[in-house]
Amino acid sequence: CYFQNCPRGXXXAMSDLELRQCLPCGPGGKGRCFGPSICCGDELGCFMGTAEALRCQEENYLPSPCQSGQKPCGSGGRCAAAGICCNDESCVTEPECREGASFPRRA
């Protein structure tokens, strides 16, 4: 299930380390599911509500929580592709997610 909408109480308090990446999707499996109808990848950009994202509905039936993307962004989202931030329902453009910004820089 997607981390944001897993059934409450089904799992004990989980640390981020226990979250797996959501299902692969898109051409050649190069994308990751970010929500039931969202498939994104660095090389692909994002597919929303298209055939490439159909597989992402399967994630709703898996019991363990997942979260795709490395860097948090926006309101409860993760960087999904260059310049794009997605949560499990939608995506927005996000300069923080541009290439080269994917890893927090240590001062």
Swiss-Prot record:
Keywords (A to Z) from UniProt: Amidation, Cleavage on pair of basic residues, Disulfide bond, Hormone, Secreted, Vasoactive, Vasoconstrictor
Modified positions (Glycine amide) in chain numbering: G9
UniProt cross-references to SMART domains, sorted A to Z: NH
Major place of residence: secreted
Gene Ontology biological process terms in this record: vasoconstriction
SUPFAM superfamilies: Neurophysin II (SSF49606)
GO cellular component: extracellular space; secretory granule
Quaternary structure note: Interacts with vasopressin receptors V1bR/AVPR1B (Ki=85 pM), V1aR/AVPR1A (Ki=0.6 nM) and V2R/AVPR2 (Ki=4.9 nM). Interacts with oxytocin receptor (OXTR) (Ki=110 nM).
The protein, known as: Vasopressin-neurophysin 2
Gene assigned in the entry: AVP
